[in-house]
From Swiss-Prot:
Residues annotated as the enzyme's active site: 38, 86
The species this protein was found in: Bacillus anthracis
EC number(s) reported in the record: 2.5.1.-
Domain of life according to the entry: Bacteria
Ligand binding (Mg(2+)): 38, 225
A GO biological-process term: polyprenol biosynthetic process
Protein name: Isoprenyl transferase
MF (Gene Ontology): ditrans,polycis-undecaprenyl-diphosphate synthase [(2E,6E)-farnesyl-diphosphate specific] activity; magnesium ion binding; manganese ion binding
């Protein structure tokens, strides 16, 4: 089921936000939340600002939502930062997007370390500029022992490409006698994906009002709950995330059963 903006906060204006957070934490919190962070460019356009201004503002929201997800005891937060299709955007915008990880981690990494957050990346890293790769590698190295929230960036990521790559590696292992055809299963294919060490997302959020998946974690979201909002990513708040989780808690997940 797909809902927009579950009205959890209506009639609760006199209740403190912190109390609401504690109430939500009494319920089941999705272990893995994935977010398609959409609408940065349109947010900027509405304000007669360049698109890169929207991306910069969106980066501030990443910091805020990461901290809040950690507070809620979410185990994995995957953020769709840059797709394999995003290279088609204007060069100036792409160049800025490739600078963002360096800028983001340059200012936020100490806080991530303090918050016990572990940074990971999925996607084709070999095509990223050297400075972008180095920034991500530094963050992963300095947080690899952290045991709190896993902040997983999907950077130059495309799900179809991921699945093709997984099948190619599986076929290579089969040719080398490491895999038998009769052994191939969902679990085996999952083990070849970039997310092999992570649970599948239980909740997928997309901002900006678009109702599509955009080649994001197609295998992993087979049983995810979807939550869409018209809010552009730079305007996304802790309250919106709490709304999404509360909506998730009110749904019945049957996994094909009755």
């Amino acid at each position: 089921m797909m809902f927009k903006n579950f009205p959890f906060f209506k009639g609760k204006k006199d209740t403190s936000f912190d109390h609401l957070v504690e109430e939500v934490k009494k319920g089941y919190i999705p272990e893995h939340i994935a977010i398609i962070m959409d609408g940065n460019g349109r947010w900027a356009k509405r304000r007669a600002m360049p698109r890169i201004a929207g991306h910069h503002e969106g980066m501030q929201v990443v910091k805020k939502i990461t901290k809040f997800a950690s507070k809620l005891n979410v185990k994995v937060l995957t953020l769709y930062a840059f797709s394999t299709e995003n290279w088609k955007r204007p060069k100036k915008e792409v160049d800025y997007l490739m600078q963002l990880p360096e800028e983001f981690l340059g200012t936020f990494l100490p806080e991530l370390i303090e918050e016990n957050v572990q940074v990971r990346v999925i996607g084709q890293q070999d095509r990223l500029p050297t400075h972008t790769r180095r920034a991500m590698e530094k963050a992963m190295e300095e947080t690899k022992e952290n045991t709190g929230l896993i902040l997983n960036f999907a950077l130059n990521y495309g799900s179809r490409d991921e699945i093709v790559s997984a099948v190619q590696h599986m076929m290579k292992d089969s040719e080398e006698g490491k895999v038998r055809v009769e052994d191939v299963s969902e679990e085996m294919l999952s083990s070849y994906l970039m997310t092999s060490s992570l649970p599948d997302p239980e909740l997928l959020i997309r901002t900006s009002g678009e109702l599509r998946i955009s080649n994001f974690m197609l295998w992993q979201i087979a049983y995810s709950e979807f939550w869409f909002t018209d809010v552009y990513w730079p305007d996304f708040t802790e309250e919106h995330l709490l709304n999404a989780i509360t909506d998730f808690q009110h749904r019945g997940r049957r996994f094909g059963g009755v």
